[in-house]
Structure formats: structure tokens, C-alpha cells
């Protein structure tokens, strides 16, 4: 009942056929954010995402009390914490009547634009934390796009709303308002500068959650490695560079196997609503079906949602039936059982990184040590220090060609190497293509330079 108390739990507005909608915002999944309320031809409701996901009205105190009750119900049962999805969208510039300049031929503007006019988000988040998370000492990590450096203390500082937020800065690189079909591949230098930029901004304010992929993104190795360069060595390099950053390393299922994007040959193979929308956007812009498929094959999140390949059995050992999405055709080779048997696999490489993080001798440095970029201007070299009670140099040659890297101090110990050998030369290291290293180096020598 839109006129009853629960009608105030949502954003419902009067509207009649032929009238202008309350605003021109486009849903994150395409089309207007306004949908006709079932059973009420004179009302529309707001949904920033799918029409089956109506937005809750967080301005309503009664609604917030219901949310707190549900959160505490879980925490009282012993739940340790929450991953909080899309939380930045709960604050909106009411009364929701502002139109923004259209950014596509459909006359609409991405709902993302409204976030700039939404003031008071941290007030809501602090109330949520005070009423639920803080009394339970719960761990919280938030999906929070478009944060500003001056707001980080309020988000993840000592008294912040959350314990951590995901670093998604890399996922929006080269994004285009026109759509996926207009996006350009991410270069190694763009990736490096973006990652380093976030590390410098966060510094010691708190801990970011470092990711290269998740359920909302394509496979990281297909996105951040140059096309055609998804070798096991390159996958290990990319994973190692992310894992060793200051912050909390997150691995998504299949990342530990080095899974890549698949090649969808027909839009019917896709389940994701945003992918279907972007395919249509590409066609509407004049792309051929082949060009539209190329775009979704690069950026669709369905790549990360395929059945997990447990073995080389039919359907990857996931099921004896028919799964909801195709199985990655690489499953005869890229599967958990095979990688467990191969000591040089991506799976075993991640285990080595995890062991290093837990090693009592290096735990303080890897977990709590400072980040400092090294040779940042050297093209396609991504290198940085982790400085704590020890000094570690993390380095990756982000290209297929070998390149020389100067050493700032003598090597005390090679902790991780994704290749069987290391070539020292002229006071440095000749890094092979996509070679990745974690080196313990002389701390006093570095400090004196």
C-alpha cells in the first residue's frame, strides 16, 4: 500500500501516463530508475539497480530501525561481520526531482551522477555502525566508489564507519559514458599509477582491501594483462603485485587458478542484466553483433560467475546436470585438481604468498609495513618497498620483454620468485618477461640512500 506506513519505506511518487517522470536518471542496469508500481497505474517507484530491487528510503527513521534489527539479529547469532554492498547509494539528493545533462542518446543520465549531490552519507553510516557493528566489535568492509581523500578518515580511520573499503579505482579505468564498446584496454602504466595513487592517498589512515577481480568484474588477468599475454608467469606477477600491497588481500574464487575470460559467441549465453544492456547499447550505437560481443567478452561480469572447475571431469566436476551458465572451456587444464598436482601452478604460487604473509619472521612487515614506490618512472616496471622491522622490495616486470632494474641495496634473501632463476647484473637485476620477485634487502643501505 503506497499510502500506508510501508509505502514510506521506499521512494514512491505520483505519476500519470504521458507525464514526465520525476527525474531523468538512468538505472545502473539501463533504462529509467522509475518503474510503474504494480497494481497502481498512478504511482512509480525508484530503483537504481534492477526493477526487482526497489531502493529503500533511508531518510525514514522507521526503516532504519528495521535495518538495525535485522543486522543485530545476525550479529547476535555470532556472525563476525559484513561485506556491505553499494552502500554509497543509500543517500540521495531528495526530493529526487533534479535532472542532469543527458550522457547518452536516450536522454538519460547515469544515476551515478546523483551521488555528487547526496550530502550526509557519513551521518547515516555512523548511526548504522553505532547501532549495530560497533557494539558487537564486528568486522565490516564496504563497497564504496568515488571516495575522496579528505573523507577517508571518516570511512576507515580509527573511528571510521568501516574497517576497510575495497580499492576499485582500477575497475573504472578508461570507462566511457557511451558504454563498454567505447572503453579502451588498461595499460600497465595506467594500472601501476592508479594502484600507487590509492596506496599513497590511504597511507597510514587505514587499510584498503586490494582486489583484481570479484563477482561484479571480469577476470583480472584478462583485464589488466596485455591481450594475448595471459601466461602462468604473467598471472603470478599480477597476483603477487596486488597481494603484497599494504592492506587486506582479497582473492575471488577462480583467481587462485588463474582463470581467464571466456569467449561468448552469442548473447543468449549471457545471464547478467548489465551485460545484456551493454550489448544493446553497443548495437544502438551502430556496432555490429561481432563488435558488441567483443565488448561484453572483455567486460562482462558473467566471466566471474561461471561454474567453478573442480576437475577435468565433464562440466568441470561442478555438476552432472546442466549448469545455469556455460563452463569455462579451459577446465580440462585450468581446474583445481590439476593445479594441486602441479607445484608450478598459479594455485601453489598464491599459497606461497599466503605462507609469507603468515610467516612470523615477515608478518609484521607484510601486514603492517609502510608502502613506498620504487623507480616509479621506469616504464612497465611496478616496484615498491614494504618497510617494517624488515625491508622488502616487491617488483614485477609488467611486459614480455626483459628489462634491467637497479637494486637499491644488496639482496639478503629471495623470498618469492615466479621463475626458477634470477639474473643479477651491473648492480641490478635483469628481469625476464613478467618476472615477479619479493626480496629482502639491506634496510640500513636503503635508509642511507
Give a label for each model feature:
Residues 1-412, 416-449:
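Active-site and adjacent substrate-binding regions of carbohydrate-active enzymes
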